[in-house]
């Protein structure tokens, strides 16, 4: 999931450099959402591993 977040962040960067504001904003939003979900799942995984 971190890989997809990085991919969308790179797409947003390239789109913003080329002047595609809408695509850049949408890609940035997807990257942020995926990054937050990945961090939450990682924290849940670390907590659940510690209890077993």
Curated annotation (Swiss-Prot):
Domain of life: Bacteria
Keywords in alphabetical order: Cell membrane, Membrane, Transmembrane, Transmembrane helix
Subcellular location: Cell membrane
Membrane topology designation: Multi-pass membrane protein
Annotated GO CC locations: plasma membrane
InterPro entries: DUF1328
TM ranges: 6-26, 30-50
Cystines in this chain: none
NCBIfam families: PRK13682.1-2, PRK13682.1-4
Record-stated family: Belongs to the UPF0391 family.
Record-given protein name: UPF0391 membrane protein A1S_3910
Organism: Acinetobacter baumannii (strain ATCC 17978 / DSM 105126 / CIP 53.77 / LMG 1025 / NCDC KC755 / 5377)
């Amino acid at each position: 999931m971190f890989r997809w977040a990085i991919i969308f962040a790179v797409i947003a960067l390239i789109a913003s450099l080329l002047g595609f504001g809408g695509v850049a904003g949408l890609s940035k939003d997807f990257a942020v959402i995926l990054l937050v979900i990945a961090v939450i799942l990682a924290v849940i995984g670390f907590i659940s591993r510690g209890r077993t």
